[in-house]
Amino acid sequence: MTVDLLLGLQWGDEGKGKIVDVLTSNYDIIARFQGGPNAGHTLEFDGIKHVLRTIPSGIFHKDSVNIIGNGVVIDPVVFQKEIEGLEKFNLDIKKKLIISRKAHLILPTHRLLDAASEASKGKAKIGSTLKGIGPTYMDKTGRNGLRVGDIELEDFKERYRSLADKHEAMIAFYDVNIQYNLAELEKEFFEAIEELKKLDFIDSEEYMHQAQKAGKSILCEGAQGSLLDVDFGTYPFVTSSNTTAAGACTGLGIAPNKIKEVYGIFKAYVTRVGSGPFPTELFDEVGATMARVGNEFGSVTGRQRRCGWLDLVALKYAVQVNGVTQLMMMKGDVLSGFETLKVCTEYNYKGQNISHFPYNIEPENVTPVYKEFKGWKQDLTGLTTYDQLPVELKEYIEFIEKEIEVPIKIVSVGPDRKQTITK
């Protein structure tokens, strides 16, 4: 029996989907434990790019069972479109995908609430993806939400109507101009609900417990990144769920002492989408080059990601919070061609150098302290072994390992699953 955990250590978009895809053959079960369709996991193989939003990244492997856990929020409409997008691969979705009855549903009015709330904030917007994630988690913690298991109840539509009416009153309270046709949105929603009913719903915590007793190997898949965690991220510019290791326990019903390996995924540089502090952000041609070469555009929103140098203060913090046992560095190939690379090793925080991640990292409080490294010119995308990597990249990797005190086991040198070097 093995229960391992894979999660992102930055502000999301680290490349988790690719690594899950690479590792899936080692596991019987891939289980998503938090987030919703605001996250996009990008996989690329055979020259074709695939973006998954809610479905776990093991769906393309014939022998794996994929679980959507109780910590996930599901938009039935988006979910149906995601399944339709997989039909061309002739996958047995009903056999390969099962859903926790305790996962919460995103209603059309959740999305409208999200838009109304964001519009009302003016310049103080937090950069919401407007997918209804925040309002759904608010209903969950406020004990008002609807769950997947409620679909099976005879009075589901009455429960829906009661909650949707509350939402409409809240939307009116915001007093912003949002145009919508709720009747049309609800028609689409209930059609998607009927499709959702065709899948198997489970009591996921019992399923996971029995799987562990049977000796099954399980990989828990996180969405977004640790610095977006509602408790440990750069609040309020965060998501509404726990993206850290603790979220796997509450989002799947797995006991903490059952988790063995914690795989931490990070980019060789840093990106962020939307608003929020970003100490190492670059506003020059270097940052623009990173975005262009790295194709740094959100897989869900399409928004260009902000780019910056690797931040070891933030990375060390994420490693500590998650108890990471192995690191995996993504997009090493994007840094090819830069004369000089920089790594933030400390923050100058209110005039004093510190090496820990403080409560407030707004620009007026934090200035990054950098160590410079010599860059490399070599194209990495065709390399297959660690020994083939340029010496400058090896020095970069070894410095990170020394500072973080966790080994880097995988270096990604391209988007395809084959462009993955094991160290």
From Swiss-Prot:
The keyword Protein biosynthesis does not apply. InterPro entries: Adenylosuccin_syn_GTP-bd (IPR018220), Adenylosuccin_syn_Lys_AS (IPR033128), Adenylosuccinate_synth_dom1 (IPR042109), Adenylosuccinate_synth_dom2 (IPR042110), Adenylosuccinate_synth_dom3 (IPR042111), Adenylosuccinate_synthetase (IPR001114), P-loop_NTPase (IPR027417). It is an enzyme of class 6 (ligase). The keyword Metal-binding applies. GO terms for biological process: 'de novo' AMP biosynthetic process; IMP metabolic process. GO terms for cellular component: cytoplasm. Its cofactor is Mg(2+). The active site is at D13, H41. Plays an important role in the de novo pathway of purine nucleotide biosynthesis. Catalyzes the first committed step in the biosynthesis of AMP from IMP. Belongs to the adenylosuccinate synthetase family. This is Adenylosuccinate synthetase. The lineage of its organism: Bacteria, Pseudomonadati, Bacteroidota, Flavobacteriia, Flavobacteriales. The gene is purA.
